[in-house]
Amino acid sequence: MLKNSLLLFMLAFVMSASAMAQNSQRTLAFEEVKAIAQAAEERAKKDNWNVVIAIVDAGGHLLYLQRMDGVQIASIEVAQKKAKAAALYKRPTKVFEDGLKSGNQGLMLLPGVIASEGGVPIVHDGQVIGAVGVSGVTSAEDGIIANSAIDALK
């Protein structure tokens, strides 16, 4: 009886470990996060733009935040919200900005949506593994910086 119980326990353990391995998703390594942040900062400095850079994981949880000198305090929250929306909705926040401009007011009813360019998902093998959000200059300029940061991983 003890032998059968032990065998069943071991079988259950192996099967659950196998199931967990199948459901594992690639995450951003800290070195990648730093490379994304550095690329964003370099792109911003190229045009003398001071911004906030936020990087989140696939669940929208903050991994990195940087506020350059002279940026308005509100940009801290805006950058985080852009990154989170891009991660959770798996699309750039420019999609929401464009939708709102074309009259789709219903987008604003979606929780966590921010209709301002500058949030871009980080995609690896077709899966969103995080996102970057930038705020501090115009939304188009925020988008330029965010997209440049994503290009650092290619």
Language-model regions: role of each:
Residues M1-L2:
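N-terminal secretory signal peptides that target proteins for export/translocation
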Residues S5-A17:
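Bacterial N-terminal signal peptides
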